[in-house]
């Protein structure tokens, strides 16, 4: 089971340090984080009921581990989002909690944390801001953004029996960005 749900409100972009409000923050954290917790837990419970072992993979982000780099957003049409790293850090910790609880049922739980992905902005037809992309690439040792194809093999590996003794881990796929 791969959980990559991404529910958010229309006010998601307003969740900056300067423009957020408590209601918007709480609503988005509830939608996004609870979708991961609830759906993954329901799936794990079903696996236990059916006596099925396997893998649950939660899609997180490097921003669940490192802070957003403010200078990447300067001069762009993007801004930091104060809810996003809170949500992703919560997903990472939930992974560890689930792994420790469901390990006895031979259910593995891991996260995949991509760096900046090449392509359209999540849930929108807009392409990424060119200045943001240039700044991001300049900080990345591999000098490019993550492509969806860069993620396929880690998801396949974690879904397979080749990872039968791996649980509670966060797999960062960011071309070295988090090292800088």
What are these regions (language model features)?
Residues 140-151, 162:
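A conserved structural motif in NAD(P)-dependent oxidoreductases
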Residues 6-9, 18-24, 48, 57-90, ...:
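Catalytic loop of short-chain dehydrogenase/reductase
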Residues 4-12, 176:
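Conserved NAD(P)H cofactor-binding loop of Rossmann-fold oxidoreductase domains
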Residues 103, 108, 166-168:
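Short, small/polar-rich loop/turn modules that mediate ligand/substrate recognition or access, typified
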Residues 156, 167-180:
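Short C-terminal tail/terminal secondary-structure segment
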Residues 40-41, 96:
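A short, exposed helix-loop element centered on a Lys and neighboring polar residues
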Residues 15, 69-74, 104, 114-140:
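A glycine/serine/threonine-rich, flexible loop-to-helix segment
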